[in-house]
Amino acid sequence: MSQSNLIGLERARLNLPGTAATDDRTIDAMIGACSDAVVKYCKRDFFPRSYDEVYNGDGDRRLLLRAYPILSVESVRYRPVTVLKVQNTDTNTNQQARVTVTRTGLTLLRVASGVRSVDTSVTWTANPTLTAVANAVNALGNGWNAQVVGDGNDYGKWPSADLYLPPSYGGGTTSQGALTTRGQVAELKLHTYELQGYQWDPRGWLLRGIPYTDPELLHPEDLIWPVGIHNFRVQYTAGYPTIPEAVQEACAEWVAIAWNATLRDPALASLRVEAVGQTWSSLFTNARQPPPQVAALLAPYRRHAVGTNQG
């Protein structure tokens, strides 16, 4: 069973009496397709997984997270500040120079007389701290220069991998950049202030709370999330330890409809011979909706983002 499949073969067979072991490959492919369709229709994941996301403070008392139910919160940080500066000072040789933060490290690109050179040797694994990253960049030559901002004994010891922020949508592997560095400084930022005054609700949001020592709180009674663009970074775990039965049944029924469609012309909705007629559920009734019985089971689990700017 694939890690992304909402049900396994055994569960699917409960809705497919009469299938044989030789059908397993086809059924398994349908389980994968229907599981993906359920996730997209509900606009959410169901399996527990870790999230590392940035949010816009909106001046409200609640900060709505994208995934729920929340199982735990690792950290809530705010105030992104520059912690590492990268520059390419050899403007005579290099006509272009850029830095990009990726999942594995820094990508440093320079173009000299039309020749592109890309260096990916500065990895988080080999350089676990910001100081180590700066030293590795400085050792490259070719005009590359980097320095830790502020107290080297503080930011310099921060984990370099924290520079990377996974995209909240899609399968991208870059976050900051590409930022120009030719003759000017590219500032790489981190959310470095740990928020103490918060509480989390399993239903999918954070609340501001005591203590009142956080600088962002102007007044003790002003328990809101200050307005800003990507001014909060939240690391948390969300999902269902066990996939809800209704979601499993919805996936199984969708698989059964897809399977039965392979036993006839899938575009055939009904057939009548003299006084005998038969009508089938169709995969093509509404391109925007799953079959009605599937939609009814999934209705309580759909994510609605109306009224939030968090996506």
Regions found by a protein language model. Give the residues of each.
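Short aromatic-glycine motifs in intrinsically disordered, low-complexity regions
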Residues: 1, 60-67, 117-124, 285
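Short loop/turn elements at secondary-structure junctions
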Residues: 2-9, 241-311
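Extended, beta-strand-rich, solvent-exposed assembly scaffolds of outer structural proteins
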Residues: 81-196
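Sec-exported extracytoplasmic/periplasmic mature domains
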Residues: 39, 138-142, 260
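Glycine-enriched, solvent-exposed interface loops adjoining structured elements
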Residues: 2-81, 251, 275
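Amphipathic, non-membrane alpha-helical segments that mediate helix-helix packing
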Residues: 34, 130-137, 251-255
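Surface-exposed interaction regions enriched in Ser/Thr/Asp/Glu
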Residues: 135-145, 172-250
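Second-shell loop/turn segments in exported
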Residues: 16-22, 119-124, 240-242
